[in-house]
């Protein structure tokens, strides 16, 4: 494999020096930008990062053997990282969207046969091959938008058989697609219809059967619970998260999206790596998250699509909570694969600056899925995941919103996207 030399970026956004801990407060604005910067890559790993003239001198005797990509006038960043998606699912729910546009409530949509249970039904009924192909098409779109690592949750199976099916497809995608997938078990996404009259029995099923089997098969690293009134209580969530910890699965939690319900506090209590959504998190919950180093994964695309007020990122950042951004890609509340659009929305609706949004979609996102030692920044020893954006500075990635500026995507030192085409 020839060395790869990415040269002369007008802005090289490195985010170097932040692998040990996520960025917080004013440190989220320190992007480590190198003007006229270059990256030398060997065997899929970053060897050197710095000003172009410095690297040209250092590798002068090897320039002839290297593959060279000239990024003059463009912006190079780490590969973007999406730490909260529901990647593997079947079907579409645009009919619910039109109902919502006409004023239908969540419960009205549920009673009409929609919501999570509609996707659960479609996902259960889909063949493994059909589910793989549909999810692969979505993953291709993530890659085209500059995303090189994705967290993927289960949660549309809601039975042992079908949760395993989702996680096995996520593993197959990880093994066959350039995008790295980090899997999360979300058997506690909702109470399935067959258990609606005995939700505690479903909780027992998750604890006694699903979690041990997922762990035994090595199909997930994380265990997530949707902790909201009418779904799972804090006590039920605590029991499932502690059971996951006992089986080696690190806790995550869908927290305080609809009302202050103690999800942020619970995340700190159980040592969760992240608490996600947080639109209605209490001041005390935010304080405990900051004290415990729990990452707040914010999902502005979801609030945008649901036409509701977004989480207050400024409140979390100023309190010292490390913040990451994610698409929440799912068919009901955030049908998007564009993390750059989410970054724009974070600036427009959450009070974040472009610098903070960039940090939140790279190194802090890597921390939120336990991958900061491998990806999320451009520095020697890390995996060579880079994106070349056809803009002169990183702010324009978000400023020209709704436009895919990702021109070239490099994954593990290989060009996997160029001029709008995926090469696998």
From Swiss-Prot:
The molecular function terms in GO held by this entry are: imidazolonepropionase activity; iron ion binding; zinc ion binding
Q: Which GO terms describe its cellular component?
A: cytoplasm
Q: Which Pfam families match?
A: Amidohydro_1 (PF01979)
Detail which positions bind 4-imidazolone-5-propanoate: 93, 156, 189, 257, 333
Q: Does the keyword Aminoacyl-tRNA synthetase apply?
A: no
UniProt GO BP = L-histidine catabolic process to glutamate and formamide; L-histidine catabolic process to glutamate and formate
Write down the chemical reaction(s) this protein catalyses.
Answer: 4-imidazolone-5-propanoate + H2O = N-formimidoyl-L-glutamate
Cofactor(s) recorded in Swiss-Prot or TrEMBL:
Zn(2+); Fe(3+)
Q: What class of enzyme is it?
A: hydrolase
Q: Mainly resides where?
A: cytoplasm
Any stretches that span the bilayer, and where are they?
Answer: none
For the keyword Ribosomal protein, the answer is: no
Pathway assigned in UniProt: Amino-acid degradation; L-histidine degradation into L-glutamate; N-formimidoyl-L-glutamate from L-histidine: step 3/3
For the ligand (Zn(2+)), the binding residues are 84, 86, 254, 328
Q: Which PANTHER family match?
A: IMIDAZOLONEPROPIONASE, IMIDAZOLONEPROPIONASE-RELATED
**Protein's name according to its UniProt entry:** Imidazolonepropionase
From which organism does this entry originate?
Geobacillus kaustophilus (strain HTA426)
């Amino acid at each position: 494999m020839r060395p790869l030399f990415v040269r002369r970026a007008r802005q090289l956004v490195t985010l170097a020096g932040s692998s040990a801990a996520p960025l917080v407060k004013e440190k989220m604005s320190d992007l480590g930008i190198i003007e006229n910067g270059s990256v030398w890559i060997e065997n899929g790993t970053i060897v050197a990062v710095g000003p172009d003239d410095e690297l040209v001198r250092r590798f002068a005797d090897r320039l002839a053997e290297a593959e060279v990509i000239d990024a003059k006038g463009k912006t190079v960043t780490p590969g973007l990282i999406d730490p909260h998606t529901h990647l593997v699912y079947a079907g579409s729910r645009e009919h619910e969207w039109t109902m919502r546009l006409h004023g239908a409530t969540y419960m009205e949509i549920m009673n009409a046969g929609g919501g999570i249970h509609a996707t659960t039904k479609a996902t259960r009924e889909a063949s493994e091959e059909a589910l793989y192909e549909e999810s692969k098409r979505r993953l291709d779109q993530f890659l085209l938008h500059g995303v090189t690592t994705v967290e993927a949750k289960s949660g549309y199976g809601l039975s042992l058989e079908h949760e395993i099916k989702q996680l096995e497809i996520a593993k197959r995608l990880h093994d066959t697609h350039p995008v790295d997938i980090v899997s999360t078990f979300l058997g506690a996404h909702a109470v399935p219809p067959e258990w609606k009259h005995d939700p505690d029995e479903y909780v027992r099923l998750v604890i006694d059967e699903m979690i041990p089997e997922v762990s035994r098969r090595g199909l997930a690293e994380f265990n997530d619970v949707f902790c909201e009134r009418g779904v799972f209580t804090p006590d039920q969530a605590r029991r499932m998260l502690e059971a996951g910890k006992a089986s080696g699965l690190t806790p995550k939690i869908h927290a305080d999206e609809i009302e202050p319900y103690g999800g942020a506090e619970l995340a700190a209590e159980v040592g969760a790596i992240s608490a996600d959504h947080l639109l209605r998190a209490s001041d005390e919950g935010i304080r405990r998250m900051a004290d415990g180093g729990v990452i707040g994964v914010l999902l502005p695309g979801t609030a945008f699509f649901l036409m509701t007020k977004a989480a207050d990122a400024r409140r979390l950042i100023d309190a010292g909570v490390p913040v990451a951004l994610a698409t929440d890609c799912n068919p009901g509340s955030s049908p998007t694969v564009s993390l750059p659009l989410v970054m724009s929305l974070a600036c427009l609706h959450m009070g974040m600056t472009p610098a903070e949004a960039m940090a939140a979609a790279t190194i802090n996102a890597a921390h939120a899925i336990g991958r900061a030692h491998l990806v999320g920044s451009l520095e020697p020893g890390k995996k060579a995941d880079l994106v070349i954006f056809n803009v002169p500075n990183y702010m324009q990635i978000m400023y020209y919103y709704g436009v895919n500026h990702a021109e070239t995507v490099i994954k593990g030192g290989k060009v996997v996207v160029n001029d709008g085409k995926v090469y696998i």
